[in-house]
């Protein structure tokens, strides 16, 4: 065996130990009992540090750490929203909060908390699948196989079909990388890239036999990590020639291990690389996974000593400004991973866990 092999093995072991020995603390969302519904679908930390929650059926929620402000249609505000199912969130440079629902797109002005529906003809009353505010202050969103571009004031700047091999595909996410390139990830499709010079989206080479769900740029390793629906996490390496669309797609065996027994492990909902340790956190259909990145490969980190036990139903994860990882969930409820050894705790309710097969925290 080569010296490089031993070096990589030692690094891998040290990486695993460094994470597991840090006393990762899991705490349930402190304001969980104040939510209008138990389940959070998406989380956003705004420019002022407040947390916003997209819920299914409970509307949009703002959390200041002590109380929850709820924006939804109810007896007091029956016509505020066409749907209380919030699908996606974004904040633009003008401090407007944009959010999609199952029946339309809305913009909230944080100066007065007034909510306006974006009444573009085609988009009105459609399910909004994804939204992204980018560096120039504009907003990109998608609904029913179409992509829409809006100014911060809510003016539609353009609309584009989200096509892959001649067929319209729904968008799972938008992503703007460090070079301000805008990417579109398609369910049942592939990758598109926006070209400002022609105001058009062009397909990018996507050799993986599974649709992309979310992507992040890894500047340190000069690649992108792409969550897929069915093939785990893929490493995407672009050509050094900016004119070339050739890419290298590397499957990551660590995210495919045990596929036959646990196929949901390869169905990824979201991922992020945390800023504190450089760990890649991955929420899949069955659990939350953690990986250390060594030599362009993912190496699993043992999470049994700090994560809730049993099967989990989670959603897309985020990192806050303090480096904590927020995990929205159905079972268990939303929880936060932090690295403060002075904080404890989670309290599993074993009786309910035994009955349901899912972890319950009190």
Question: Residue locations for each model-derived region?
Answer:
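Carboxylate-rich, polar loop motifs that coordinate divalent cations or form catalytic acidic clusters
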Residues: 1-362
């Amino acid at each position: 065996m080569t010296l490089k092999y031993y070096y990589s093995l030692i690094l891998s072991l040290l990486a695993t130990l460094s994470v597991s020995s840090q006393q990762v603390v899991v705490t349930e969302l402190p304001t969980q009992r104040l939510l209008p519904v138990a389940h959070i679908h998406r989380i956003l930390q705004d420019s002022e540090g407040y947390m916003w929650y997209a819920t299914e059926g409970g509307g949009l929620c703002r959390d200041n750490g002590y109380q929850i402000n709820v924006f939804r249609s109810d007896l007091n505000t029956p016509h505020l929203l066409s749907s209380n199912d919030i699908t996606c969130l974004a904040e633009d440079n003008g401090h407007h909060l944009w959010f999609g629902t199952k029946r339309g797109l809305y913009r909230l002005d944080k100066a007065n908390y007034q909510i306006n529906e974006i009444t573009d003809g085609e988009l009105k009353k459609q399910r909004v699948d994804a939204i992204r505010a980018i560096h120039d202050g504009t907003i990109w969103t998608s609904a029913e196989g179409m992509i829409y571009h809006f100014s911060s004031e809510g003016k539609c700047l353009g609309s584009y079909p989200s096509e892959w091999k001649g067929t319209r595909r729904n968008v799972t996410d938008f992503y703007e990388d460090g070079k301000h390139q805008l990417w579109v990830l398609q369910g049942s499709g592939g990758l598109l890239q926006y070209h400002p010079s022609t105001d058009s989206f062009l397909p990018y080479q996507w050799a993986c036999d599974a649709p992309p769900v979310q992507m992040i740029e890894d500047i340190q390793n000069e690649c992108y990590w792409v969550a897929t629906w069915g093939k785990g996490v893929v490493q995407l390496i672009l050509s050094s020639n900016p004119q070339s669309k050739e890419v290298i797609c590397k499957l990551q065996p660590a995210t495919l291990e045990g596929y036959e027994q646990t196929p949901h492990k390869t169905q990824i909902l979201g991922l992020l690389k945390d800023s504190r340790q450089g760990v890649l956190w991955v929420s899949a259909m069955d659990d939350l996974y953690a990986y250390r990145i060594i030599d362009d490969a993912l190496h699993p980190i043992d999470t049994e000593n700090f994560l809730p036990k049993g099967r989990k139903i989670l959603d897309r994860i985020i990192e806050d400004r303090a480096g904590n990882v927020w995990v929205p969930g159905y079972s268990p409820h939303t929880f936060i991973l932090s690295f403060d050894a002075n904080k404890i705790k989670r309290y599993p309710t074993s009786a309910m866990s035994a009955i349901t097969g899912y972890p319950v925290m009190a």
